[in-house]
């Protein structure tokens, strides 16, 4: 295997015949670096196919209907498998053959599918973050976010991925040393700069902004929910001060009970007006688990794509860096393919409770209930929210029952009295 000049790993880095100041630049590969790159690509392709296949098999074994999160994991696994089959594998074949063996139609199809798969992977990741955002930040709307809407939203994301890949159809075959190379049709330096910025914004920068917004809001709402629990406990403590007041008179016992409940309700409503999430039961552990899962996937997306696009933009404006091929640059150019390998192992690492369907839904509490409903609610929450305060509620409940019995006995005695 002799030294040769070939196309770089990724179609966006057009270092094969880069135009810089009207001068065509051909980066040189050595044989050892080419062998290393092919070996790493083969390993990445196998890991992506094997890991995502395991995830799909695990979900297929489940006999129950898939939840929204599980359905999105299926879509992510399918897109990662498509990256391995239609992006990594064609790149391996092209690097082994050195030259492109097809015609112009095959060249355009190759340029289109290799980039469309990466668009699809990024956009489906955004849909996953959107699902978590609706589930956590808008729990009432989440009940209308059915599996059918997940299918429709994912289909829209895939359609946008195909639309964003249309510029790749403008590809050409370049004659080089007795063979042909397939590359985008970038005849001027300005076209190359516009092409690089389009790839940077559509695949990395805009998705990154959306992911930061979704997960920023999720973290804020989770923090608010935790703070709301503390507010609920403090309001419960203030309500207990009313409950501890002794019952002085049999006649005013029912009225004082109603006043205590009214004061407790007013305090809770006042706190909920400041913090709407304080009236909720909080974010469940299963939702926290899915947040950690999707956050890990997004973190891997950022780690893998940031160095790659940094090199892409640096090569766009630096002619010397554009023609350089060092092991460090090759490793950085391989990172986008690594993202498809890490996702399935993240899913399996969080498989403890993610695969389990949530049996109950969290509904926000309302405060339009009757006096008896409030007393039952307070009694039901004695083990979690108020702790030892249940003793006070129980004692007052017993006192009310005793007063009612005393009233009944007194009435019976008066009716049976000969006077």
Curated annotation (Swiss-Prot):
Record: glycosylation sites: 3, 22, 185
Classification via InterPro entries: GPCR_Rhodpsn, GPCR_Rhodpsn_7TM, Vasoprsn_rcpt
Cytoplasmic side: 59-80, 130-153, 214-292, 351-419
Coiled-coil ranges from the UniProt annotation: none
Positions of the UniProt region annotated as Disordered: 253-274
Domain of life: Eukaryota
Tissue specificity remark: Present in the nervous system and peripheral tissues.
Single Gene Ontology BP annotation: G protein-coupled receptor signaling pathway
PROSITE patterns: G_PROTEIN_RECEP_F1_1 (PS00237), G_PROTEIN_RECEP_F1_2 (PS50262)
Gene Ontology CC: plasma membrane
Keywords on record: Cell membrane, Disulfide bond, G-protein coupled receptor, Glycoprotein, Membrane, Receptor, Transducer, Transmembrane, Transmembrane helix
A GO MF term: G protein-coupled receptor activity
PANTHER family: G-PROTEIN COUPLED RECEPTORS FAMILY 1 PROFILE DOMAIN-CONTAINING PROTEIN, NEUROPEPTIDE RECEPTOR-RELATED G-PROTEIN COUPLED RECEPTOR
Family recorded in the similarity comment: Belongs to the G-protein coupled receptor 1 family. Vasopressin/oxytocin receptor subfamily.
Protein name: Octopressin receptor
UniProt gene name: OPR
